[in-house]
Structures are given as structure tokens and as C-alpha cells.
Amino acid sequence: FNNAYLASENDMLKEALDFSVQTGFIQDFSIVAKVILDQKSPFLKSLLINKGTKNDIEKGMTVFSKDYLVGTVIETNYLTSRVLLLTDLNSKLPIVIEGTDVNAILEGTGNKLNLKLSYLPENYKIEANKIIFTSGKDGFLTPGIAVAKSYLNDKQKIFIKLLSDPDQALIVNVTNGQINK
């Protein structure tokens, strides 16, 4: 049993180390960390990771699980850091919608299956199956990082769902948000 767990964790770590190569992130600014506490609350969503200022983690750095953005470092200590997830009510991310020049803000709702788009142009209706990317207008993240997708539910209503599942994050990559193009 213990060997199977270690083998599984080893595979996750290898995948995390390949992250910078797969996504184009600069290796010097990609730090692998383990999630040590998942703050469960209906609306407040955060993770505690096992890397801090000792490992050059800084407030404002971006956090990825697998290949997808899950949040931002909001607090650092010597050995740990707190990550605000995109699903948190306090999370607001400037985005652009695939195939358009429409900018908006992706807001957390506490529900990973239905985030909110704010500040859309008047009378704009988002279509289903559109990828939502970072716009870069926050000055931290490079534009073009895929974050979420629009879906049509059973009631023919559009909802926004993250491409990642922050609740499943065990190993994460912490970066400065810049892509090596």
C-alpha cells in the first residue's frame, strides 16, 4: 500500500517538474510545492503549500495545478504560503474570451462549477464552448493562459467552469506568471 502511494506521488512530482517545459514557463521561476492544507469553506477557498520565503515564494506569484492556473499567492511565511484559489469570492481575474476582443473579470463564487463574468459589454452574450484566457491587464500574468470554459447546461443556460479542479490539487507549481515566448 505504501509503495503504491509513493509511486503515485513520484509520478505527480515528475509531471510537475515537466510543467515548465510543457507550458513555456521559465524554469528559474517555477517552484514545485505540495499542498499541506485545503481550507474548506462554502465561499472562502484557499490552499496552504509547503514552500515559503525560504524558497523565494513571493506574494502575487501564480499557482498552477497540472497545466492550469488555480490561484495566486496571497500570504507568505518562512516555510509556507497561502494560495487564494480562483473559486474564492475575493478572486478577480482580468480575462479575454476566445475569438473575441471582449474583456471582462472572472470572479470566484465559491463554486468551481459556475464562476461569474463581470463587466461584460452591454448586450454581449457569451456562447458555449468558448475558452477564457488571462488578458494580462492585471500587470502580473502573461496574456493567453487558458483558465476556464463556457458550457451550456441542461436548462440551456451558459455557465463558466474552470479548466482545473482546485479541490484535486496535491502538487502545484508556483511561478512569477511570465511565459518564455
Model-based region annotation:
Residues A4-Y5, M12, A16-K181:
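A secondary-structure micro-motif
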